[in-house]
Amino acid sequence: MERIDLGKVNRLPAAILENLPESIGNVGCYSVHVEEDCVTVVDQSKVARRGRKPTVMEISTEIIRRRGVKYRVMGYTRMNDAYRGAGVAALVYELVAKQTGPIMSGSSQSGGGRSIWNTLAKRGLLTVLANWKGVYHEVESTEFGEVAAYNFSLYSTAARLCAA
């Protein structure tokens, strides 16, 4: 997994309510909608204007199968600036893992992505493991905002994080 740096400003366009699939659940007042290639989180507390509601975050996803297990790969996560720092991303990842099956990290992660997986490991509601060379290894959260594996360096190898 590689470390990457991303831009700091995100202004996501409002979501058109008719185009969204059925919600899989809520995180506070935010509804989570899962499609084949995207997870969209919409703020339900705001008044809809012209059939649109503010988008809190979007996660690009893809479905892969490894050793007979179907994973949803959580790729690029974009968060609207107005909702940053509220801890919504880790809660959305937990909800998606519980409702749709195991999730997996992408091949590269920004600082924010590493922080999300660290929060998942710290909360302990999901089992977070590192998949490296076909073997699952335990990981632990660190005070540096990223998870660490016991036997190898997680971010300098081709390892992927998995949660279920």
Each model region followed by its residue ranges:
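Non-catalytic substrate-recognition and accessory regions of acyl/acetyltransferase enzymes
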Residues: 1-84, 90-164
